[in-house]
Amino acid sequence: MTEHSKPRPAGIAPAAETRSDLTGADHGQGNTVGTQRRHQRITLKQPLLRSVSAAERLRMWLLRQAWFHSVLLPALPRQLRWILRKMYLAPVDLADRLLGRHQPGLPPKADIFTGGVVDFAASGKRTLETIRSVAGVNPSSRILDVGCGVGRLAIAMPDFLDANGGYEGFDIVPEGIEWCKQHIVGPHDNINFTLADVYNKEYNPKGSRQPADYQFPYEDEAFDVAVLLSVFTHMLPIDVDRYVGEISRVLKKDGRMCASYYIITPESLQLMNAGRGFMFFKHNLGSHWIHSNKVPELGIAYDESYLRGIYSKHGLSDPPDIYFGRWCGRPTGLDAQDVVVATKL
């Protein structure tokens, strides 16, 4: 999750250097002092930068290990998992600020609960370009972002949408929605966020409503595109069925649904069992596979034929367009996860 500070225009000195030139009685002495101070700052920053880079590399390496997802994480209590993530990333956030690498308008890394995103802003832009390419999103589109998190896609919306377009994001994690409401505002007053009080064993254990009973707070045929980034990878079959039905309801005719999954096919199963990928689902439950019986919502993969049946049931195109990802060890792919794009018939 590397972020760089905006480069300083040529010829403009840092404030500290400018003050030395303006107030020093002897310009040569002032320049010497300024050089010494710059050298001290660089000397102090270098080990800090190395430490932060090492911490980031370690985190990304862990997220690429199948045993980390399928063995270690399920063994830890949910509260401890979330505390450890914050404890690990909070010093990285502090170091970013000291190094001048934190970008205003982006959430602290310790508050990002949506997986192994290296560059949050760049990830949002790439996601937008992907849905423009595969789902036909344009600046006038009405977009529904199911499971918007801390705004990975939403941060790209203010510069993308025109006055005719609109964005609605909802999520079940209160902290994510609160951050989005405070920090993401569009010029046309057409970007909105909603907290869904929906239960999930991993992401919202205090939620009062079951996802299988949840009705999206939107009118019929309100959206051109619905986007779900790594949402169904944490939802059980009965809940996926409900959400797909609700998405079909709120999509306009010929609207597109773009969702990411881990899809079990003969190819992905062979690669996964050979240890080629960074995800491993060891429990086969027929329609779906899971990391852990203890906390199924940590990671769920779906059988391709099962997904196609749900899509067909709710009036979405079958077969949908599937862009297989790299999670199981494929050398190439549109994304790490599999991306499925379907049209409302």
Over which residues does each language-model region extend?
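Helix-to-beta-strand junctions that scaffold the AdoMet/dcAdoMet cofactor pocket
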Residues: D162, M235-L236, L251-K252
